[in-house]
Amino acid sequence: MAPRTRQVKRTGDGHRRRAKSVTLKDVAEHLSLSPATVSLVLNRAPGADSIPPETQDRVFAAARDLAYQPNYLARSLRSRRSFSVGVLVPEISEPYAAEVMSGIESHLLEQGYHYLVASHRRSTAVLLEDYMELLEHRAVEGLILVASEISTAPRLPAVVVSGHTELEGVTNVVIDHDRAAVLTLSHLMELGHRRIAVFKGQPGSADTEDRWRAILEAAAGLGLEIQPELTLQLSGEPAGEVFSPADGYEEGYTFGRHLLERGAPFTALFAFDDVSAIGATRAFLDGGRRVPDDISVVGFDDIQSAAFQNPR
């Protein structure tokens, strides 16, 4: 099937202009349905459930074939809603943030929402607050913050992914750090590991203290001692002006080398995240160690790229 393109007409003076946009009324007339029915379906309104599935399929197919584009400005003015959400991330290209963003995008688009993204690049708290205010001025209906700590409650409904704030009106979405720590350490101990090195998270990360507490409590419950000489805290300090995704891998590599240079024997590493685990793995291999034969490596998050590492 040939790709659809917008029709272009020529005016009397030879200039090109776009053909008139297809309206919701045009779609309704094409299907011999009422505009109200078509509107319910295309806007996925609650009343759409009462419309037969085959009719809904016809509406979506016709909207596609006619290249219908909803007028979001008119829609917003009528409903006094923007159908948009603001998303704040530390760094868009960071593997963890990128995966979370992909999920956010898919769900919002399915629900008929658009989104605006801002990256504060782990800069100052002031910049983060400025971005929240900027997004509010863009009339977004809510905020989603990914691994971003805030100190004041936004005026809009907000969800923080990997957040631990107790601010009123803010919902936190976090993984079960306690269960993750127990499962990881139990598995390593079943493999025979007792001297397990640990990468504690960067001081500026929202998950650092929760994951560290979970590891210590899990270790105590399993009768495992976390050795101070095998514990390193990632600095989170950027190589340049701001922290970048590459810095996370580099830091994991650097701290992996530090572990080897200390000379204290260890047979496994429990890293704060997959990015630092991947960096450390490269350091171990470059240092002549086999992974996992000599050193087992595991990290929090389970990002997609970790499944494609060799070894994995």
Where are these regions (language model features)?
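Flexible loop/turn connectors
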Residues: 5-6, 253-312
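Periplasmic-binding protein-like
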Residues: 131-132, 139-146, 197-200, 242-244, ...
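Short acidic capping loops at alpha-helix termini that bridge into adjacent secondary structure
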Residues: 195, 226-230, 290-297
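N-terminal helix-turn-helix DNA-binding module of bacterial transcription factors
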Residues: 1-80
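Short beta-strand elements in bilobed, periplasmic/extracellular small-molecule ligand-binding domains
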Residues: 108-119, 216-249
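Alpha-helical recognition/docking segments in bacterial nutrient-uptake
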Residues: 1-9, 14-19, 23, 80-186, ...
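Hydrophobic alpha-helical segments within soluble ligand-binding/sensing domains
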Residues: 171-198, 213, 217, 248-260, ...
